Amino acid sequence: MDNKFSIFKKGQYVLDLGSFPGGWSQFAAQKVSHGNNNLVFSVDIQNMDAIPNVIFIKCDISNEIEILNDKFHNKKFDVILSDMAPKACGNKQVDHANIINLCEMSLDIVIKFARENGTFITKILQGEYEKEFYQSMKSNFKLVKYFKPKASRKDSSEIYLVGLGFKKDFQ
């Protein structure tokens, strides 16, 4: 994904929502860190092993958003990632609605904490509410693209939306 969209650059601040087990955080830290600067903030409800140059915050963004306000103060992020996924129940429509709900919560965090022209990447499941969420992304970003990793099964409804060029003045 980074090869296609050139997302990460040295010195950027990155927020990783739903960071457990830490793959995205580790990759981002390798791309953006210089020296011993902590430029990546990881947030999850599950504890995560320590990663160099990553600050981990344990919280549930659905009901503990004030924790992020306290930790970030007025910090703005260049890149916000959301790989959050609810526990699957096996019903495709319910699972889809639940992940879209997490995407909407993530977008609210983007609106609050993203730097102008920032990037937002979120995992979604294709389905009934996908186009509505895509339109919400288009309202907030100059460009929105779909991305399906090569490693993803062809029959999987899991896909990523990549928002480029956050329109801070829209708010």
UniProtKB/Swiss-Prot annotation:
Entry keyword set: Cytoplasm, Methyltransferase, rRNA processing, S-adenosyl-L-methionine, Transferase
Catalytic residues of the enzyme: K123 (proton acceptor)
Role according to the record: Specifically methylates the uridine in position 2552 of 23S rRNA at the 2'-O position of the ribose in the fully assembled 50S ribosomal subunit.
The protein's name: Ribosomal RNA large subunit methyltransferase E
Presence of keyword rRNA processing: yes
Gene this protein is translated from: rlmE
Family, as annotated: Belongs to the class I-like SAM-binding methyltransferase superfamily. RNA methyltransferase RlmE family.
Catalytic activity: uridine(2552) in 23S rRNA + S-adenosyl-L-methionine = 2'-O-methyluridine(2552) in 23S rRNA + S-adenosyl-L-homocysteine + H(+)
Enzyme Commission designation: 2.1.1.166
Organism (species): Ehrlichia canis (strain Jake)
Keyword 4Fe-4S (UniProt): no
